[in-house]
C-alpha cells in the first residue's frame, strides 16, 4: 500500500506579531555627569554640551550682556566666515524680533500721494479734456473731503449748549395749562417754596421707586443663585463627600474650583466671632440701647428660670443653658455640681477633670504632704548647761607636760588631714593618772619619752589650729567665749 504523507504547516493564528520597537535616540556622552538629553545628529553630545567636542561645527554664542559684560555660554553654529558673528537659538530669535520692530518704526504708513497714484486709474476722465495734473488735483480734493474729521470743528462753548428742562419733553400739552408759572422769569417767595416742595416730593417718590426696583433685582438674583446652588448640590453633593477618587483630571480641576468658590469670602473661627461682635456693636450704635435686648436671639439665651424669670445669660456653644445652669441639662457630661461640705452644700458647676469628685476652688481638698521634714535632734540639757571646769583653755593645752601614750590612739582626723586631740569629755582624769603611773613603772623610759614628744608636738599643732577659728566668737564685753572642741 502506498502511504500518503501530509505535512501541516504551522499557522500564525493566535500568535502575536512582535511590533518592532523604535530605536530610542542615544543620550549625551557628557563625562562629568550623566546627561539624558538626546544627541545631535551625527554628534556625540547634546546641544548643551556640544562645545566639549572641538571638531563639532559649533562655537560659543557671540552675545555679550550689557548688564554684567558676560558672554552667553550656549552653543551657536559656526559661521562661514572665520570672524563672523553667530548667535544661539534664543538670541537669534530676539535679534530677529528687534530687527522686525525697528523696520516697523522706520517704515511709516502709505503717503497720500502714493494712494492717489494707486487710485488714479479708477477716476472717470473724459478723453482729451483733462490732463494728468488736473486729474491728480481732483483726486486730492476728493481725498481731502473724505478725510474730514471732527477735529476741524471749533470747540463748543457753554453758551452754545442747550438749556432745556430734562422733563420738558416728557410733559404733555395739557401740562402747560396746568402750570402757568412754568415760563415765568420772576417768582415770589411763596411760589419758590411751593415749586421746591413739589420737586422734592417728586424726587422722593422717584428714589422710593428706584429702591424698590433694586430690592426686586436683588431678590431675583438671590433666588436664581439659591436655585443654581441647589442644582449643583444635588448633582455634585455626593462627589464632594466621597472625594476626587474615580474622577478625570478635568473633573478634578472643576471640583477644586467649585470648592474654592464655596469658601470664597466666608469667615471661619476667630474671624467669624469678631465679625459677629462687630455687627452687634454696629447695631447698638445705630439702633440705640432699645435694641440691645434683641441682639441676642432667643435660641441663644439660657432656658433656665429663676423665680419665674428667664435667665438672660448667653448659652454655651452647642447647648441651651448658661454656665450657671448647665447642670440642669441631663444630657451633658462635661460638668458636675460641687458637693461642698456637710455643713454648707455647694451646687456650683465644675468641669469634669481627672478626679472622680470635682470640687470648686473653695472646697478643693489639698493632697497629703509628700515631704516630711527631718526631726532635729534635741541637745540634752546637761550638755548645754555644763560647768565651765570641763573646758580647757589654750594655755592648759600647751606642750609643757608629756601626754600619755593612750591619747595617740584616740586622735581624730579632720577634713584638712590635721590630727586633733580627743575631747576632754570622753575620758576620766583619774583613770589617766593611774595609767600614767603604771606606764612609768614599766621601765621603758626611752620609748615612752619619744612617743610622748611626738604626741605633744601633734597635739599642740592641732590645738592651735582649732583655737584660731574660735577667735571670731566674742561676747558682749569683747572677750572670747570658751567653746568645746568636738
UniProtKB/Swiss-Prot annotation:
Phenotype caused by lack of the gene: Conditional knockout in podocytes results in glomerulosclerosis and kidney failure, leading to early lethality.
Subcellular location: Nucleus; Mitochondrion
Pfam families, sorted: zf-C3Hc3H (PF13891)
Cross-link Glycyl lysine isopeptide (Lys-Gly) (interchain with G-Cter in SUMO2) mapped to chain: 78
Name of the molecule in the record: KAT8 regulatory NSL complex subunit 2
Biased composition (Low complexity): 442-454
Residue ranges, compositional bias (Basic and acidic residues): 135-144
Species for this entry: Mus musculus (Mouse)
Keyword Zinc: no
GO cellular component: actin cytoskeleton; cytosol; histone acetyltransferase complex; mitochondrion; NSL complex; nucleoplasm; plasma membrane
Subunit structure of this chain's protein: Component of the NSL complex at least composed of KAT8/MOF, KANSL1, KANSL2, KANSL3, MCRS1, PHF20, OGT1/OGT, WDR5 and HCFC1.
Record lineage: Eukaryota, Metazoa, Chordata, Craniata, Vertebrata
Role of this protein: Non-catalytic component of the NSL histone acetyltransferase complex, a multiprotein complex that mediates histone H4 acetylation at 'Lys-5'- and 'Lys-8' (H4K5ac and H4K8ac) at transcription start sites and promotes transcription initiation. Required for NSL complex stability and for transcription of intraciliary transport genes in both ciliated and non-ciliated cells by regulating histone H4 acetylation at 'Lys-5'- and 'Lys-12' (H4K5ac and H4K12ac). This is necessary for cilium assembly in ciliated cells and for organization of the microtubule cytoskeleton in non-ciliated cells.
Amino acid at each position: 500500500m502506498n502511504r500518503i504523507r501530509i505535512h501541516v504547516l504551522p499557522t500564525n493564528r493566535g500568535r502575536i506579531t512582535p511590533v518592532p520597537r523604535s530605536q530610542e535616540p542615544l543620550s549625551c556622552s557628557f563625562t562629568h555627569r550623566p546627561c539624558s538629553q538626546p544627541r545631535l545628529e551625527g554628534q556625540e553630545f547634546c546641544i548643551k554640551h556640544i562645545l566639549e567636542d572641538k571638531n563639532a561645527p559649533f562655537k560659543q554664542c557671540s552675545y555679550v550682556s550689557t548688564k554684567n559684560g558676560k558672554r552667553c555660554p550656549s552653543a551657536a553654529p559656526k559661521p562661514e566666515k572665520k570672524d563672523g558673528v553667530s548667535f544661539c537659538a534664543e538670541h537669534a530669535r530676539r535679534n530677529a524680533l528687534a530687527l522686525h520692530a525697528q523696520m516697523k518704526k522706520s517704515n511709516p504708513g502709505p503717503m497720500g500721494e502714493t494712494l492717489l497714484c494707486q487710485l488714479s486709474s479708477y477716476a472717470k476722465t473724459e478723453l482729451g479734456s483733462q490732463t494728468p495734473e488736473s486729474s491728480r488735483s481732483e483726486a486730492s480734493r476728493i481725498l481731502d473731503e473724505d478725510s474730514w474729521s471732527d477735529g476741524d470743528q471749533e470747540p463748543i462753548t457753554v453758551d452754545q449748549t442747550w438749556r432745556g428742562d430734562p422733563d420738558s419733553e416728557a410733559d404733555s400739552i395739557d401740562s402747560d395749562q396746568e402750570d402757568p408759572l412754568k415760563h415765568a422769569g420772576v417768582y415770589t417767595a411763596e411760589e419758590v417754596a411751593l415749586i421746591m416742595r413739589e420737586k422734592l416730593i417728586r424726587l422722593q417718590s422717584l428714589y422710593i421707586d428706584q429702591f424698590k426696583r433694586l430690592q426686586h433685582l436683588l431678590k431675583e438674583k438671590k433666588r436664581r443663585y439659591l436655585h443654581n446652588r441647589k442644582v449643583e448640590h444635588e448633582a455634585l453633593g455626593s462627589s464632594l463627600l466621597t472625594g476626587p477618587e474615580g474622577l478625570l483630571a478635568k473633573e478634578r480641576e472643576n471640583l477644586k474650583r467649585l470648592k474654592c468658590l464655596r469658601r470664597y469670602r466666608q469667615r471661619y473661627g476667630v474671624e467669624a466671632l469678631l465679625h459677629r461682635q462687630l455687627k452687634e456693636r454696629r447695631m447698638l450704635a445705630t439702633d440705640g440701647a432699645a435694641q440691645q435686648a434683641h441682639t441676642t436671639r432667643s435660641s441663644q439665651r439660657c432656658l433656665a428660670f429663676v423665680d419665674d424669670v428667664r435667665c438672660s445669660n448667653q448659652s454655651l456653644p452647642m447647648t441651651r443653658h448658661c454656665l450657671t445652669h448647665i447642670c440642669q441639662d441631663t444630657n451633658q457630661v462635661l460638668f458636675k455640681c460641687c458637693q461642698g461640705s456637710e455643713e454648707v452644700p455647694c451646687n456650683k458647676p465644675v468641669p469634669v477633670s481627672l478626679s472622680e469628685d470635682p470640687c470648686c476652688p473653695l472646697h478643693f481638698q489639698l493632697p497629703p504632704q509628700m515631704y516630711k521634714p527631718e526631726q532635729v535632734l534635741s541637745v540634752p540639757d546637761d550638755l548645754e548647761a555644763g560647768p565651765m571646769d570641763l573646758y580647757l583653755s589654750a594655755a592648759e593645752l600647751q606642750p609643757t607636760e608629756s601626754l600619755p601614750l593612750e591619747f595617740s590612739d584616740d586622735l581624730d582626723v579632720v577634713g584638712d588631714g590635721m590630727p586633733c586631740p580627743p575631747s576632754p569629755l570622753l575620758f576620766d582624769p583619774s583613770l589617766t593618772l593611774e595609767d600614767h603611773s603604771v606606764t612609768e613603772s614599766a621601765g621603758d623610759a626611752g620609748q615612752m619619752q619619744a612617743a610622748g614628744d611626738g604626741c605633744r608636738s601633734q597635739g599642740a599643732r592641732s590645738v592651735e589650729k582649732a583655737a584660731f577659728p574660735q577667735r571670731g566668737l566674742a561676747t558682749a564685753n569683747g572677750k572670747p567665749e570658751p567653746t568645746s572642741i568636738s
